[in-house]
Design a protein with these regions (language model features):
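Non-catalytic terminal/accessory segments
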Residues: 1-492
């Protein structure tokens, strides 16, 4: 599969390249000279059709692909195009919670064309104002709470439209090992790339990176500088600054935010990718080519990053230099959660020889990755299992919801549980994880049995009846994601 521009920059897990193939890092790209006009000015007075909007973005994409230093001077009219705004509106979740204005998707849609025309005019004349983000907290698997931002509906529409336009530029720039929140890329493609790299490259050490509070601490000043590498349209830059400076509303109080971008906003994933593209991706690619003495693999999904090294000395040196680089851009590696562990085909024997027990494991995108040897031939492979606390957290959610649905009709609850189990299997259904899938299905059935017994005046329903309900409504686990090496599913 090709990159967003139609061509991959490099294989996701390439072998070490010659040292003279380096690429400029972020510092070398700042102040890249005079802005060049993009010659893509469109007549914004007419109402464009869907084909016009897509064709215009296609020209932006081709220009960005052709000239990697081109700075676009006229982009705002693509964003306030009625067709772009309309496509953005229909791409939003219909049942999403409202922001500070209380506006819902359905209510806004009752006067959609009038509302979009009004929004377009405000964007055109610079009268659009971003509203503060309503902050809510959701529980994490480890018991802590993650802050999320609920954006006002019109801000969602404008952000989604802007992301559509900016993706036309940045998808030609982003590197192959970046997977998070990009068109045509997914978590399982990142998992496949990591699995393939661990099995096909000479990897003996894994560096599991954790950036402390990344979304809360990225620098607005640096982010704007990075955006300006490609965007010379000051109106678009100011639009982004409006979102960054809108602040958050928490417990009825508006809080000014001077750093970070709230998780939950439509633009946040793209802005985060732009930030890490310049802070991490370009730098690590140059480091691999110029500094690494052995093989090195890289997989990044947003701020979740795993690297593999052939040489421990490379891993130690890289970690030290990355720590300094992160500090320059107002970021910090978590000193306890960032770990270097022996992991690879020799890890089991090496640790056994040194009396250190089994190799350590690491977590990535919901899976615990474990060093094992196949029983059939003793060869090294990577076992991927559902993270235990993730599984338990999901069961806790099911338990709480069953209490609320205790008196609902059995078929209605059965359909809901069917969707829960199917969704869980659809994500976690990888080879050698079948036992965890069966445990999840069994535990869901047990929780359902307990909920039914509480509403029954005759005690618990007999297990034979319960078994029939489980077999009818809870699908059996299946492998939804075959071995990456077998299906050649790595995106490059």
């Amino acid at each position: 599969m090709m990159n967003g521009a139609g061509k991959s920059d490099r294989p996701v897990v390439p072998e070490k390249s010659p040292n003279n193939a380096g690429q400029p890092v972020a510092e070398g790209m700042e102040g890249s000279g005079l802005a060049k006009g993009n010659l893509l000015e469109q007549n914004a007075s007419r109402t464009p059709s869907r084909g016009d909007a897509l064709s215009a973005l296609g020209r932006v994409r081709q220009a960005a692909k052709k000239d990697k230093k081109l700075r676009f001077t006229a982009l705002l009219h693509h964003i306030y195009s009625l067709e772009t705004l309309r496509m953005a509106y229909f791409s939003l979740k219909k049942e999403a919670a409202p922001g500070v204005d209380g506006e819902t998707w359905r209510h806004y849609g009752e006067q959609l064309e009038v509302n979009l025309q009004n929004l377009s005019e405000r964007l055109k004349r610079g009268a659009y104002r971003a509203k503060p983000v309503r902050r809510v907290y959701i529980p994490k698997a480890d018991g802590r709470q993650r802050p999320l931002g609920v954006t006002a509906l019109e801000d969602k529409i404008v952000q989604r439209a802007a992301v559509e336009v900016l993706n036309a530029i940045y998808e030609t720039d982003f590197l192959g090992f970046s997977y998070g929140f990009r068109p045509g890329r997914s978590q399982h493609q990142a998992l496949d790339a990591l699995y393939t790299g661990l099995l096909t490259r000479k990897v003996n050490w894994v560096l599991d990176l954790d950036i402390r509070g990344f979304f809360d601490h990225l620098s607005h000043e640096w982010l704007v500088k990075f955006i300006e590498h490609r965007v010379a349209d000051r109106r678009v830059v100011r639009l982004i600054q409006k979102w960054l400076n809108a602040g958050v509303l928490e417990d009825g109080k508006r809080i000014r935010v001077e750093e970070g971008t709230p998780q939950g906003g439509s633009a946040s994933p793209l802005l985060a990718n732009v930030y890490l593209h310049y802070v991490f991706d370009l730098w690590v690619q140059a480091w691999r080519r110029k500094r690494a003495h052995g093989n090195m693999i890289i997989v990044r999904f947003a701020d979740d990053i795993v690297l593999g090294f052939q040489e421990k000395s490379d891993a130690d040196q890289f970690r030290a230099e990355l720590t300094e680089r992160m500090r320059k851009f107002h970021l910090e590696l978590h000193p306890e959660k960032t770990r270097l562990l022996e992991f690879g085909p020799h890890a089991i024997d090496s640790r056994k020889w040194h009396g250190e027990g089994k190799p350590e494991t690491f977590n990535f995108l919901g899976f615990t990755h474990i060093c094992v040897k196949k029983r059939s031939n003793g060869r090294f492979t990577v076992l991927r299992q559902t993270i235990r606390r993730r599984l338990q957290a999901k069961l806790n959610e099911v338990k709480a919801e069953l209490q609320l649905r205790m008196h609902d009709p059995i078929p209605e609850v059965g359909k809901w549980l069917q969707a829960v189990v199917r969704g869980h299997v659809r994500y976690y259904g990888v080879p050698m994880n079948r036992s965890a899938l069966y445990i999840f299905r069994f535990q869901v059935g047990r929780l359902w049995h307990r909920a039914l017994s509480r509403r029954s005046q005759n005690g618990r329903p007999l297990w034979d009846r319960m078994r029939r309900l489980i077999n009818r409504w809870l699908p059996l686990p299946t492998v939804c994601h075959p071995y990456p090496l077998r299906r050649m599913g790595v995106i490059t």
